């Protein structure tokens, strides 16, 4: 009997031990329970939940931390659960935080963002960086390492060292080394040799935090360290100056492409036909407003609306240009003063018409996603995508117009009329028709320029006035009627403006460029690339 009792007691103890150990083998909390802990009013409880979420290993953990940081993680009062939210029509568009399933739309008061303080924000940033260090994507690991530059947190530095020991990607390893070397400069425990090695390694870095860390060692007691810091800062300054020059040149090319688009249509109407069209800026404005109207007609089509706006702007501005030539300009050939006054009056009419139709207020055009953002080459030099696209677009328009004038029947007739109008008429070319088509072509290209300008500035009735003078300067400087001269002049003036602006300011830079062109025209009245042969004789 005692043996049976002892055996039963032993089995009972084993069962109790097994039951006590079994919960330890299973997760004590699920991801849903962690999210529910964020409802607590205690910031300490939220800190624990954030830490658990970051270390959960769940594929949605990083996105949920980002949503919490951006105040997009909400408490839905109706269901009393944590959801994701996006602003929509004054309310919230709700989504499941894990599956991202649509949960419908609620009023603004029906859901409240989870509140966090600055301490929790820093905790999230640090945890995101630690999670990012173990991301399979090398670019994400590099970004995480870079985001930790300047940190003094021992746990984060330990995580960086652990990652560095097994990192096989060169760029990621370099980013981690930069962060660790910067930490060595801030550390009171690092010896002189360690700091000197760190300074040497950081001497080529362009990170602002690295520069600040180096400056913090300028008051070091060790002369060798001060000298090393000064040498490193000089190297950084030299590299920064080179990239700033490259940045200035890029903005100069960007301005040059805008001037090219604005002036290339004028190069046809003024250069080929000899017509001083003061309404050219308003034709650019019509192209910009066409872009605005297309986006209003297709409110959900911002990503492809430019593909519709470009031909639409060309046709609308070109049609208006043909009307101007047919009803006004054709009666004023050979009378430049009257032409100037008439086109100036047309420009005022177009401006007032736009004010009546669209109101005098500026209108904004939404930039497509594929034109937004920038190509970040390093911390001090980046190329914005919208300007890169506009440079490429300007060159495409230039080459297209060049092919039209050189390889098509219309181009042949335009060149014939521009060289000798009477002979062209004698050969059966209808010069009045060619005049209308040429004016329409130049006006259409002005409209296309307006599409590009709408991506850089607000669309308003006075948009064209900002470019009409610059357009005439480009055409005159490059050589009247010469497209290659227009290209060279546009980029030359654009780069010159941007090189002068840091020294003299934007207004004085334009004045200096204008004075230079006046002096240049005194020396070479026909511009950089004057017409030759019969066209020059005309």
What are these regions (language model features)?
Residues 332, 338, 342, 357, ...:
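Cytosolic-side transmembrane-helix boundaries in multi-pass membrane proteins
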Residues 339-407, 434-437, 511, 535-538:
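Transmembrane helix-bundle core of multi-pass membrane transporters
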């Amino acid at each position: 009997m005692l043996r049976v009792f002892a055996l039963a007691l032993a089995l009972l103890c084993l069962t109790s031990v097994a039951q006590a150990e079994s919960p330890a083998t299973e997760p004590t909390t699920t991801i849903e329970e962690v999210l529910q802990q964020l409802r607590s009013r205690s910031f300490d409880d939220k800190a624990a939940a954030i830490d658990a979420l970051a270390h959960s290993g769940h594929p949605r953990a990083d996105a949920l931390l980002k949503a919490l940081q951006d105040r997009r993680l909400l408490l839905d009062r109706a269901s009393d659960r944590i959801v994701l939210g996006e602003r929509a029509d004054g309310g919230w568009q709700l989504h499941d935080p894990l599956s991202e399933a649509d949960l419908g739309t609620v009023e603004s008061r029906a859901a409240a963002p989870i509140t966090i303080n600055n301490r929790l924000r820093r905790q999230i940033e640090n945890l995101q960086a630690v999670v990012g260090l173990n991301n399979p994507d090398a670019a994400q690991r590099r970004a995480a390492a870079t985001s930790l530059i300047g940190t003094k947190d021992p746990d984060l530095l330990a995580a960086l060292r652990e990652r560095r020991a097994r990192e096989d990607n060169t760029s990621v390893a370099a980013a981690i080394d930069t962060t660790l070397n910067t930490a060595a400069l801030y550390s009171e425990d690092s010896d002189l040799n360690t700091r000197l090695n760190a300074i040497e390694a950081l001497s080529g870095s362009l990170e602002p935090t690295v520069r600040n860390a180096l400056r913090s060692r300028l008051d070091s007691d060790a002369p060798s360290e001060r000298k090393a810091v000064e040498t490193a800062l000089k190297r950084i300054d030299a590299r920064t100056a080179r990239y700033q020059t490259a940045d200035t040149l890029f903005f100069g090319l960007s301005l040059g492409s805008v001037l090219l688009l604005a002036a290339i249509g004028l190069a046809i109407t003024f250069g080929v036909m000899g017509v001083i069209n003061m309404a050219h800026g308003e034709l650019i404005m019509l192209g910009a407003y066409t872009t605005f109207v297309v986006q209003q007609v297709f409110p959900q089509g911002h990503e492809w609306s430019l593909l519709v706006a470009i031909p639409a702007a060309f046709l609308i501005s070109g049609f208006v240009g043909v009307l101007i030539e047919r009803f006004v300009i054709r009666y004023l050939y050979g009378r430049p003063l009257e032409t100037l006054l008439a086109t100036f009056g047309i420009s005022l009419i177009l401006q007032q018409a736009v004010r009546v139709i669209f109101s005098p207020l500026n209108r904004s055009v939404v930039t497509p996603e594929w034109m937004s953002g920038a190509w970040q080459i390093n911390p001090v030099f980046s190329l914005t995508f919208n300007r890169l696209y506009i440079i490429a677009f300007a060159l495409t328009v230039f080459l297209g117009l060049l092919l039209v004038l050189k390889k098509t029947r219309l181009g042949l007739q335009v060149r014939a009329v521009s060289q000798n109008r009477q002979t062209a008429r004698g050969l059966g070319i209808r010069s009045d028709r060619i005049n209308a088509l040429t004016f329409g072509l130049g006006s259409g290209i002005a409209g296309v320029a307006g599409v590009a300008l709408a991506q850089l500035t607000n669309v308003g009735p006075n948009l064209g006035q900002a470019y009409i003078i610059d357009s005439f300067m480009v055409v005159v400087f490059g050589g009247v009627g010469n497209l290659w001269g227009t290209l060279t002049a546009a980029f030359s003036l654009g780069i010159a403006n941007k090189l002068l602006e840091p020294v003299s300011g934007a207004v004085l830079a334009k004045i200096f460029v204008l004075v230079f062109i006046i002096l240049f025209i005194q020396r070479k009245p026909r511009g950089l690339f004057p017409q030759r042969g019969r066209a020059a004789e005309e």
